[in-house]
Amino acid sequence: MSDILKIGKYEFTSRLIVGSGKYPDFQTTRDATLASGAEMITVAVRRVNIMDPNEENLMDYFKDTDVKILPNSAGCTTAEEAITLFRLVREATGIDIIKLEVIGDTAKTLYPDVMETLKACEVLAKEDFTIMAYTNDDPIMAKRLENAGAHAVMPLAAPIGSGLGVQNRYNVVFVKDAVNVPVIVDAGIGTASDAAVAMELGADGVLTNTAIAQAKNPIAMAEAMKHAVIAGRMAYKAGRIPKKPYATASSPLEGLIEF
């Protein structure tokens, strides 16, 4: 049975999105991405070349694949910077699906500036971009981003690169309940079990970069993430049993042999 992830006009069979940072070279980036089964790889346009054909270009490593490049605005601290960047990206590459992130704290937490993100979202939506908006795990802001035109919201699990996993499970559920667009848990994933937890909570997908790129064996971790996302999604759809404080016998008490 198909289980398609729809983000705006785009459809994906994989619910795992990977990043492109912190790899030693583009070939390793390619190998890990293909091992993950992901159909999108996000790229910090201000740090990784996808626009200059005269320099080594990450897009060249994925031309023979079905992996879609997802430009992001990492490094931007204002709405204006992000808007300008994405206009340049679309002009140079034709890519119109984007990961919008505007960072408020560049020193320690890399938390998003949600008000600047919201301003950028309003403008870019009017220009027909397909917007995936990185935000905090706040259902109110998630709904505002949806109303502003975001096609997916991406609440953080924990600070970017921290590897802490999902720190507030209830907020993931609250965000999921608040919006009618896909919820992609982004940032803070440390290992495969973190991805599975996010999916079990009802997230529509997971984005991870550091957990794969900085693993001792990135290819093996990419494969682990692939299976974790699938397992978490299957468990969510299957429906977990309720948690109870006391035991419940798994075998019936009726018909016991009397001694």
From Swiss-Prot:
It comes from the Bacteria. Pathway: Cofactor biosynthesis; thiamine diphosphate biosynthesis. Pfam families: ThiG (PF05690). The active site is at K99. One of its GO terms (biological process) is thiamine diphosphate biosynthetic process. It is found in: Cytoplasm. Keywords: Cytoplasm, Schiff base, Thiamine biosynthesis, Transferase. GO terms for cellular component: cytoplasm. It catalyses: [ThiS sulfur-carrier protein]-C-terminal-Gly-aminoethanethioate + 2-iminoacetate + 1-deoxy-D-xylulose 5-phosphate = [ThiS sulfur-carrier protein]-C-terminal Gly-Gly + 2-[(2R,5Z)-2-carboxy-4-methylthiazol-5(2H)-ylidene]ethyl phosphate + 2 H2O + H(+). Catalyzes the rearrangement of 1-deoxy-D-xylulose 5-phosphate (DXP) to produce the thiazole phosphate moiety of thiamine. Sulfur is provided by the thiocarboxylate moiety of the carrier protein ThiS. In vitro, sulfur can be provided by H(2)S. Homotetramer. Forms heterodimers with either ThiH or ThiS. This is Thiazole synthase. The gene is thiG.
